[in-house]
Amino acid sequence: MCVRDNEIVEFRKWLSTSFDFLGESVGMFKLSHDMACQIIAQTELYLNQGRRNEAYEEIIRDVILTSPRGIFAYEDITGLPWIEIDFQADVMQAKLNILPRILNEKKQLWGLSEPT
């Protein structure tokens, strides 16, 4: 994902525009009902066009880039504990390494323990 002037200007694996900074989408989105419907409609369009092998990012990209400024935003999660879960081994990695970090940070936030 590429950001320029605090707006998402690209949302794909290859870059085609200038940007101030870039980052990776972790694939978690909070959408309004209207935006969810637009993504569904765009997905249906891709399917009707026979574009069944496109990455999901392309559909989201189309909706982001055709929406008015300010509709979509991003969060910088640099340094926050997270893991992409694709396989069973990733679940175990999350359980053993990520979850304890999240719980520790939560305890620190609430003043329940000393930092480790």
Range-by-range predicted roles:
Residues D34, Q38, E44-T116:
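Left-handed beta-helix
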